């Protein structure tokens, strides 16, 4: 009986020493104040650019099969509104179909 009381008392002392109360000392995160800043960027809400105009998103380009595509001019990447995807009529037709699907899922407002 005495041995079990000694074991329990020792266990409680170890627990108290090993796990101090949170109230006894504030941790560093409790002392700091955290803020979050939300920045809202205005984006195009309607199709306003024609084929050949520079763009950043599909929503900016006007037309069901017109997308904001990337071309390389002098080794430099340029984004512009385009609907032609190939010189081949068959491939161009397939490309316009893909552009239409891409515009459908762009969720432009």
Curated annotation (Swiss-Prot):
Q: In which tissues is it expressed?
A: Expressed by the venom gland.
Annotated coiled-coil segments of the chain: none
State the disulfide connectivity: 55-68, 59-108, 61-81
Q: Give the UniProt entry's GO cellular component terms.
A: extracellular region
Recorded GO molecular functions are:
ion channel regulator activity; toxin activity
The answer to whether UniProt assigns keyword Secreted to this entry is: yes
- The residues of the propeptide are 19-46
Keyword Transit peptide on entry: no
* Span of the signal peptide: 1-18
Enumerate the UniProt keywords alphabetically.
Disulfide bond, Ion channel impairing toxin, Knottin, Secreted, Signal, Toxin
Question: What is the annotated localization of this protein?
Answer: Secreted
Q: What does this protein do?
A: Putative ion channel inhibitor.
Family affiliation: Belongs to the neurotoxin 25 family. F7 subfamily.
UniProt note: domains: The presence of a 'disulfide through disulfide knot' structurally defines this protein as a knottin.
By what name is this protein known?
Hainantoxin-XVIII-4
What is the native source organism of this protein?
A: Cyriopagopus hainanus
Please spell out the taxonomic lineage of the organism that makes this protein: Eukaryota, Metazoa, Ecdysozoa, Arthropoda, Chelicerata
């Amino acid at each position: 009986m005495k041995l079990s009381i000694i074991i329990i008392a020792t266990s409680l002392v170890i627990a108290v020493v090993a796990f101090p109360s949170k109230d006894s000392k504030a941790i560093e995160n409790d002392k700091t104040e955290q803020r979050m800043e939300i920045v809202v960027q205005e984006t195009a809400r309607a199709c306003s650019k024609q084929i050949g105009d520079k763009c950043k998103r599909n929503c900016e380009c006007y037309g069901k099969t017109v997308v904001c595509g990337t071309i390389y001019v002098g080794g430099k990447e340029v984004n512009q509104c385009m609907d032609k995807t190939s010189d081949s009529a068959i491939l161009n037709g397939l490309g316009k179909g893909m552009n239409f699907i891409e515009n459908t899922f762009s969720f432009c407002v």
